[in-house]
């Protein structure tokens, strides 16, 4: 799975409304418009959505490699810095290290130029 069309076809990303703006190894950029059906009881973008975006950005960066056929997230960490109450969310993912069947990546999530969250993850490649 390494073509842009295959990445876009992800049912989960479709459900969230994610737009894959760029996916060229070792980087990706995803976009998501804030919507009421993605918020928590306080009216801000749900933390699980943010974690999903962080994971998806790094996953798209990895899967855009010709050599990577599939991935499994083995660890995911997200640091949250501020709430998202409206606007367009941009996530930039990057593969930082890849060796053998393991890869590590980072992603930065922004809303209107403000850093909202920073995430890192480890992946098993196959």
Which residue ranges define each predicted feature?
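Terminal targeting signals and extreme-terminal segments of soluble enzymes
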Residues: 1-126
């Amino acid at each position: 799975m390494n073509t842009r069309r295959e990445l876009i076809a992800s049912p989960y990303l479709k459900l969230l409304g994610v737009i894959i703006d760029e996916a060229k190894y070792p980087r990706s950029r995803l976009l998501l418009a804030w919507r009421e059906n993605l918020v928590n009881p306080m009216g801000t973008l749900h933390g699980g959505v943010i974690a999903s975006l962080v994971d998806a950005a790094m996953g798209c960066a990895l899967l855009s490699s010709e050599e990577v056929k599939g991935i499994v997230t083995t660890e995911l960490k997200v640091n949250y810095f501020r709430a998202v109450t409206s606007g367009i969310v941009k996530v930039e993912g990057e593969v930082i290290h890849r060796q053998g069947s393991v890869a590590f990546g980072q992603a930065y999530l922004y809303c209107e130029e403000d850093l909202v969250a920073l995430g890192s993850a480890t992946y098993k490649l196959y």
